[in-house]
């Protein structure tokens, strides 16, 4: 070793280090993919290597299924499976990683088919929703029928889920699905509860002064007494119909009310709920 003034040159000489600039991700195309993955995304940027140094890429912390170097400014990633939005994209070349850029999202769920599309107001039956992007596994999928959450949701596949319908009433309720942090946005798929049906009236007659309490037996009367639930006796026009008084909701198959004053035999009786009318039943007479 050389020494000057008793100092060793090896210990006093500075060590000179050199490194290339880290890779930099600028943009990607496309910016989204189905949740089942396998799509191809082009990653554009800088410092990916003048030759193929076998770069690697990650989306949302998951390594791309494969990464193909194309140039110093472009590589290709085969997208892994995933869900959600706002995912980071990272490239590594020669042991150096780019800063994370949140550029990628998986497609939102898309409900496209529903069977059956209607059902009784008592609920607790299953409907199957067909579509896309429901997830590559059970990610705690959520389903709303209008503003009503399904009692239970069972993930079947990326293209099918099952919903246990809650008790309720109403029609044309948009079906919405959430997977991860993404909600479906389509307004085309709708569910409706079946309209009311009158099967029989007991007793089937009352004197013309009214005041008798009758039971109206049927189905799809809803889940509770609401202002839109009404029962009528008489013709279906504003002059002939008489609204039952003191209407009481017993359950989805029975109503009770006081008969209004009236005359005539074979009077039509019908129930209305959220604007939907039952077909008339002619089982009541004064």
Model region roles, listed by residue range:
Residues 48-64, 134-150, 221-241:
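Short, surface-exposed alpha-helix to beta-strand junction/turn motifs within ectodomains of secreted
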Residues 71-73, 157-159, 251-253:
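Residue-level recognition of beta-strand termini and adjacent short loop/turns
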Residues 1, 88-92, 174-178, 268-272:
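Extracellular recognition modules
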Residues 80-85, 166-171, 260-265:
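Surface-exposed, short loops/turns at beta-strand junctions within beta-sandwich domains
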Residues 5-52, 96-139, 182-228, 276-286:
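Beta-strand/beta-sandwich contexts
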Residues 34, 65-68, 120, 151-154, ...:
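Short, exposed beta-strand/loop patches in secreted or surface proteins that constitute
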